Regions:
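N-terminal catalytic cores of NTP/NDP-binding nucleotidyl/phosphoryl-transfer enzymes
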Residues: 6-16, 20-83, 199-230
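Active-site cores that bind ATP or allylic diphosphates and position pyrophosphate for catalysis
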Residues: 68-70, 76, 98, 112-274, ...
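A glycine-rich helix N-cap at a beta->alpha junction
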Residues: 78-102, 110, 117-119
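Substrate/cofactor-recognition hotspot
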Residues: 311-319, 323-568
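Amphipathic alpha-helical scaffolding segments comprising HEAT/armadillo-like alpha-solenoid repeats
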Residues: 567-573, 597-609, 632-648, 671-683
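Alpha-helix N-cap/helix-start positions at coil->helix boundaries
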Residues: 578-582, 614-619, 655-656, 685-690
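Alpha-solenoid helical repeat scaffolds
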Residues: 586, 590, 603, 607, ...
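Structural signature of alpha-helical solenoid repeat scaffolds
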Residues: 592-593, 623-630, 663-666
Length: 693
């Protein structure tokens, strides 16, 4: 811990209260219980850091327990991946346990519960049970098999265990209270028949316990003191305690369940089902695709374990759900890599630069600092020659006033090298620049101390010597989704929000010091961002993944789009006031083009809703967005908001608002008929020929 004492989170306070009440510290025990049906993702990292962090804080053991109670979805591949991820994150577990280790004990307890009249075999169909269970506002009713005799229940349960029945014919249910306000207490399932091969127990078992029965009992077997879950299990706590009541021995530690808010990240999907869909549909290239929020995907992209741990510590532990900006995760990564990643030069979109007054055949090895944030990182030598590669975007023949890069007649400094001035260009038959000719100031070598070296110029460019450059494949990764909440829109498939430019592969050049890089080595490509050597890289073909940019491009883009929308409303005010028809049309054209350029679905929807008010200009803006944005259609807007928009717009004093509302209604067949009365009234009262038309 740091010298500055941090305040306790509410889970830590609960533990402190337990200790203060006399609970022995040597009895503290925690666990991390993943189901091996997928890869761990960044959401799991919060729970991992919490549980293992508690273990470190209180010097208490933390078990890794695999909740392997559903052989239909679980595989050894996932077990191995989870263990690898935990170790990579820097955590070691006390014992490796499996719920399947306890199958016999769980079965024996179930038999005892049957004998005690606390469980019974139900032979209804799942649909019949669902009806019989009632609703949140209506109590359930007893099923026809609830009062089976103990003897019949034991015989049927034994038959289920022996594989005498098909899947779905019988289940074991706890006998609790069919009128409970908590629907989970209305005789929940304990066991079901599954004729599936289990990755550890093979075909030994034909019945498998349900999560709610296995989880708390496993905690009890392992003597877990504090069972920490996410908030969706709040309603399960009553059932957790009821099951423990059936087996609890007062001489042992009784586990208690506590809940905290899970991690929700914007621009991210963390449902295992949806992540699996991305993999199976080949939207991504496997679970460790660098665009995935899985721990293995983040690791491959170049995230460090330290940055993820720092991120989890920064967001803290809370009782209320909230959405964390993924930019914070990137910030934690930049903060770590800035201190540790060596600086190197790479050119991703090269154009040749020839220094015409530099002697042919000459080369110099210039000194370059590896990391100005770390004095111990030292220096390296970088070759400089007559022919160099620079980024194509770093040159313009004729540059605007605030272009701080290279242009004809202007000077820039080459990083660690000389000041150059662009003199001319060579173009191909299509007019594309193939070469830039420049001259250099022989006395301007960086760090030489000469007057020329101290001269201020427009900017500093990175470069690579042509004769020494090493080819490399560079994979430019970006966010997988373009919307803040891709799986939160009822009328939309989360795949509708895929970022079509989430991966761009380019072939560039890197400096020769990178010839012997190893997988997972991390670098800052100066002026470009942080990059990591991919697992597919080899000595014959270097492959780098873009890990994160030097700045948050999405934040800049988001602000730009928000500012664009604000400015559009100002332009609409001009449009409405303009008397000249041609000038008005010319004002409207860029407004429509700007509407089409907005990618953020949530921003578009929110802007429409925000402008549904008794203001003609605002209504005009909302209707323009609905008509011209290719990101939304009418049914994407909540019906109450949409109805209000149409109703207010048809009554607007501005003919242009009424016209747009009618056009939008024509494209909205589901709602068009609902406004026939208002449209008929317009026909009778409207004086504007355009509206009537």
């Amino acid at each position: 811990m740091s010298t500055e004492e941090k305040s306790l989170n509410f889970i830590e306070q609960i533990i402190e209260d337990s200790l203060a009440s006399g609970f022995p510290q040597d009895k503290l025990r925690f666990r991390f219980p993943p189901e091996p049906n997928g890869y761990l993702h960044i959401g799991h990292a919060k729970s991992i850091c919490l549980n293992f962090g508690l273990g470190l804080r209180y010097n208490a053991p933390v078990n890794l327990r695999f909740d392997d109670t559903n052989p239909a979805k679980e595989e050894q591949e996932y077990v191995d991946a989870i263990k690898e991820d935990l170790q990579w994150l820097g955590f070691n577990w006390a014992e490796e346990r499996y719920a399947s280790d306890y199958f016999q004990q769980l079965y024996d307890w179930a038999v005892v519960m049957i004998k005690n009249g606390k469980a019974y075999i139900d032979s209804q169909s799942s649909s019949a049970m669902a009806i019989q269970k009632g609703t949140p506002t209506q109590p359930g009713v007893d099923g026809p098999f609830r009062n089976r005799s103990v003897a019949e229940n034991l015989t049927l349960f034994e038959g289920m265990k022996n594989g005498d029945f098909e899947e779905g014919t019988h289940v074991l249910r706890a006998k609790i209270d069919m009128s409970s306000k908590n629907m989970l207490m209305r005789d929940p399932l304990m066991y079901r028949v599954l004729h599936r091969h289990h990755h550890r127990t093979g075909n030994d078992w034909k019945i498998y316990p349900m999560y709610d029965f296995a989880h708390g009992q496993s905690d009890y077997i392992e003597q877990i003191s504090h069972s920490i879950c996410t908030l969706e299990f709040v309603m399960h706590r009553e059932l957790y305690n009821w099951f423990l009541d059936q087996i609890y021995d007062t001489t042992k530690v009784r586990p208690n369940q506590y809940e905290f808010a899970r991690l929700n990240l914007n621009y991210t999907v963390m449902s295992k089902r949806k992540l699996l869909q991305l993999v199976q549909d080949k939207v991504v290239n496997g679970w460790d695709d660098p665009r995935m929020p899985t721990i293995s995907g983040l690791r491959r992209r170049g995230y460090t374990a330290k940055s993820i741990r720092n991120f989890c510590e920064t967001i803290g532990v809370a009782k209320r759900e909230n959405v964390i900006d993924v930019s914070l995760l990137d910030f934690c990564l930049r903060e770590d890599l800035n201190k540790t990643a060596p600086r190197v030069m790479a050119v991703l979109d090269p154009v040749k630069l020839v220094i015409t007054n530099y002697p042919e055949g000459k080369e110099e090895w210039l000194e370059a600092e590896n990391n100005q944030e770390d004095e111990s990182a030292g220096f390296r030598k970088v070759p400089f020659s007559r022919e160099l590669y620079i980024e194509r975007e770093d040159f313009l023949e004729v540059a605007p006033a605030k272009f701080f890069r290279l242009s004809i007649g202007n000077e820039v400094r080459l990083k660690n090298g000389y000041i150059i001035k662009a003199e001319s260009v060579t173009k191909d038959l299509e007019g594309n620049i193939t070469q830039i000719e420049a001259s250099y100031d022989t006395d301007s070598l960086s760090g030489s101390g000469t007057e020329a070296s101290k001269r201020k110029v427009a900017g500093t460019l990175h470069w690579v010597s042509v004769s020494h450059a090493i080819e490399a494949e560079v994979r430019l990764y970006d966010r997988l989704f373009i919307d803040e909440a891709p799986d939160a829109h009822k009328e939309k498939n989360f795949l509708d929000f895929m970022n079509k430019t989430s991966l761009e592969i380019v072939n560039g050049f890197v400096e020769p010091s990178l010839i012997n890089v190893k997988v997972n080595d991390k670098f800052q490509f100066q002026r470009l961002g942080y990059f990591t050597v991919d697992k597919e890289s080899s000595t014959s073909k270097l492959v780098f993944n873009k890990t994160v940019g030097l700045k948050d491009a999405w934040e800049e883009k988001g602000k730009k789009e928000e500012n664009l929308l604000m400015n559009m409303l100002k332009e609409i005010n001009k449009y409405v006031k303009e008397k000249d028809e041609n000038t008005a049309k010319n004002t409207l054209i860029p407004i429509i083009e700007n509407i089409k350029s907005i990618d953020n679905y949530s921003l578009v929807i929110n802007t429409i809703v925000k402008n549904i008010k008794n203001d003609n200009n605002a209504l005009l803006f909302a209707n323009l967005i609905l008509k011209h944005s290719d990101k939304v259609i009418a049914k994407d807007i909540e019906i109450d908001h949409l109805t209000k928009l149409y109703s207010m717009s048809l009554k607007s004093q501005l003919a242009s608002v009424r016209i747009l509302a009618i056009n939008n209604l024509k494209n909205d067949s589901e709602n068009f008929s609902n406004f026939q009365t208002q449209l008929a009234e317009l026909k009778n009262s409207e004086k504007n020929s355009n509206v009537l038309e």
